[in-house]
A protein has these predicted regions:
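A glycine-anchored, Pro-Gly-centered beta-turn/N-cap motif
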Residues: 97-99, 176
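Bacterial Sec-dependent N-terminal signal peptides
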Residues: 1-25, 154
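Structured interaction patches on ligand/partner-binding surfaces of diverse proteins
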Residues: 106-138
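Short, flexible loop/turn segments at beta-strand junctions in immunoglobulin-like
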Residues: 93-95
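Extracellular beta-rich repeat passengers
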Residues: 142-493
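Short, acidic Ser/Thr/Gly-rich low-complexity loop/linker segments typical of extracellular
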Residues: 47-90
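Conserved "repeat-terminator" motif of extracellular CCP/Sushi domains
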Residues: 8-10, 128-141, 145, 154
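A short, solvent-exposed beta-strand micro-motif common in secreted/extracellular proteins
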Residues: 89, 99-109
Length: 493
């Protein structure tokens, strides 16, 4: 008796189309001879992190809803298929397993474009007949690209190379690409239109000295490192060599919105007042944002995968409805009176690090951070938050040595849901080897008010580190009276 098995080959299809080069500069020297030599490549969809998708679904009012536009960068993948256009711009990709992909096409000197969520069916697929969408199943607030729309043609425009100083008002045009090869200053107003791409060579800085504006909705503009942008193969930009720094100064009241900034080292620096950063995506790099000013607001923004200090803030500002994910020394608030509310801090080394000042930390969610809040000589009000699964401490205090004496912390910790069972919830002495600023000294000079909280632990002393745990600590963490039921008004509202 014998048996045999057969394997079914997956259904495959082809994709054909045409890319044209359009010289809209008015310079006849840039007129193309033909449309050959354009690279066309097909990539698997970017992975949508299930952690962020879960937060998007549970709290749709915070952060940015991720999709292919926010997550896809062709430099992080090998292509599924690729080819080069003929003289008339035509191309054909063959033997593609049926499914959904992202299409990338580029030519040196002519920029690069992405088309998201291309569906390849069995048999022949022609680009002009294919429906594509930019947001897949996760909608972006105030965007109307969720419905599928016909692609009539693929177009590339000449790359624009920017000089070191631009005196007049400047527009980053829709669907155009810009390469910055040296430090560049914009002295007059700047407009970013939808889907404008700016590529900055490693080591370069961009300064905006006047107003900067961009649309409230529509396709996102993007600023990133130029490293590896014009190759179809895997070529992840190296953060160590990229000193890309974007500085906005001298003009109050800018609204930075609806864009994506990636692969930074020194980050976006704001040196002006009344600036709003909203509906932005910052990803992959060292420092995301440095704020130097007053009345600054960051809201409905996603900041993820930064390897060093993610944010350094000075001045008085409001940080609300953001997602901070997978960063290192995450939200540093230095010498400031900040209001930090309705944010989700997840899988960071440090969620918030207040340094001096009287920060209000209210209605946030801290999940799976090594340290939820690690304060240094600060007096924050910590209320109506939720703390889940901190790997070391939910909250710790640290002193700061100034010349011949120590400055200490005096937090007020009330009305929080604290779910710590197998780790320390609150410690008033930091671990000297792990905390970035940790001195090993006791962080307070008085008892700490941690009353009116809900505790999952039955024996609360087991999740505290105070005078009962060390001979050098002479102060208590006061937890009575306590709340016996989960506080419904705590956490993100």
């Amino acid at each position: 008796m014998s048996s045999c098995s057969t394997s079914t080959k997956p259904e495959t299809g082809s994709l054909s189309g045409k890319v044209i080069l359009v010289n809209d500069t008015g310079d006849p020297a840039l007129d193309p001879i033909d449309y050959s030599g354009i690279t066309v490549a097909l990539y698997n969809l970017a992975y949508l992190d299930t952690t962020i998708v879960r937060i998007n679904n549970k709290y749709p009012q915070i952060g940015v809803h991720i999709n292919q536009e926010t997550e896809f960068d062709h430099r992080y993948q090998q292509p599924v298929a690729k080819t080069i256009t003929n003289t008339d711009g035509s191309f054909k990709l063959i033997e593609i397993i049926s499914g959904e992909y992202n299409l990338v096409y580029f030519k040196s000197g002519w920029g690069i474009r992405y088309v998201y969520n291309i569906v390849i069916n069995k048999g022949e697929n022609i680009i002009s007949d294919i429906n594509a969408q930019i947001t897949d199943n996760h909608k972006i607030s105030n965007m109307d690209e969720g419905s599928k729309a016909k692609i009539t043609e693929l177009v590339l425009y000449p790359m624009k190379y920017l000089s070191s100083t631009i005196q007049n008002a400047y527009v980053f045009q829709e669907d155009h690409c810009y390469l910055i090869t040296q430090d560049t200053s914009f002295l007059s107003s700047v407009v970013f239109q939808n889907s404008a791409f700016g590529f900055v060579n490693p080591g370069c800085r961009i300064d905006f000295w006047n107003s900067v504006s961009m649309p409230e909705s529509g396709k996102r503009w993007w600023i990133t490192s130029s490293e590896g942008i014009f190759t179809s193969e895997l070529n992840i930009p190296g953060d160590d060599d990229n000193v890309l720094k974007i500085r906005i100064a001298n003009y109050d009241g800018n609204i930075i919105r609806n864009g994506k900034i990636s692969n930074l080292m020194d980050g976006l620096e704001i040196n002006s007042d009344d600036t709003i950063i909203t509906k932005m995506v910052f990803t992959n790099g060292f420092t995301a944002i440095v704020l130097n000013g007053n009345n600054l607001n960051i809201n409905q923004t996603l900041i993820k995968s930064f390897k060093s200090r993610t944010n350094v803030f000075y001045g008085n500002s409001n940080i609300s409805q953001n997602i901070f994910y997978n960063n290192y020394d995450n939200l540093i608030i230095d010498s400031s009176d900040f209001n930090v509310n309705n944010n989700y801090f997840i899988s960071n080394w440090v969620g918030i690090r207040p340094i001096y000042g009287n920060t209000i930390i209210r209605n946030n969610c801290f999940w799976n951070n090594v340290y939820g809040i690690s304060m240094l000589a600060s007096n924050p009000l910590i209320e109506y938050n939720e703390f889940f699964e901190s790997k070391r401490y939910c909250i710790q205090t640290q002193p700061n040595y100034v010349q011949v004496y120590f400055d200490h912390c005096n937090p007020v910790i009330n009305h929080n849901n604290i779910y710590a069972i197998n780790q320390i919830a609150i410690s008033i002495k930091p671990d000297a080897h792990d905390g970035y600023y940790a001195s090993g000294g006791v962080g307070v000079i008085n008892d700490i008010d941690a009353t009116y909280n809900y505790w999952r632990a039955i024996d609360i002393d087991n999740v505290l580190y105070d005078e009962l745990d060390s001979d050098i600590i002479h102060y208590k963490i006061l937890f009575n009276p306590r709340i016996n039921a989960k506080i419904l008004s705590a956490g993100i509202q």
